[in-house]
């Protein structure tokens, strides 16, 4: 029987939310060159995949965290999935901007969140952890308790693992880079000779 990590990896590869190009690396927004590109927003266009991810995120939250008061999504990639999960769990939803609005109330957190609330943050993708932990800090600065973060995918970079540990935040992901590589080889998306470039 397949693990959750493998099932999610299979779905992400199938809809091309994850692309692997060992011979022609992608350039990320950070300027890094990488043989993998992940765009989990694509999952929203596939009802079966979208629903599967929503159900699994909700299951993880229900199993790992007690007495959650609200769900927060990190803008922009986790807004839709976060709202779907909050709806399924019957919880309030807010989203966290990367920077405050430059007009109006200049909010960093959009929606109604009560100070003292226990919040689970949903993220679509964790790479270095920088933007994810910035969202955690915004919720903490608002006077709320961050129970943890749940994400669809992580690259598993050691720098991110260390950053989450330093910030005392539990990170749980549905899938990861290693699971994608295993699934990509199993389904012949890539061949064994390309693995060395990808590891």
Protein language model regions, located:
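Phosphate/pyrophosphate-binding loops at sites that engage ATP/ADP/AMP, CoA/4′-phosphopantetheine
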Residues: 57-69, 136-142
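Short, glycine/charge-rich flexible loops or terminal/linker lids adjacent to PRPP-binding catalytic cores
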Residues: 76, 82-120, 128-134
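Active-site-facing substrate-recognition patch
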Residues: 1-65
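PRPP-dependent phosphoribosyltransferase catalytic core
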Residues: 2-14, 137-199
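Conserved hydrophobic/aromatic pocket- or pore-lining residues that grip, position, or stack substrates
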Residues: 31, 71, 93
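Short glycine-rich phosphate-binding loop at a beta-alpha junction
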Residues: 66-75, 150
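Conserved acidic residues
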Residues: 69, 117, 147
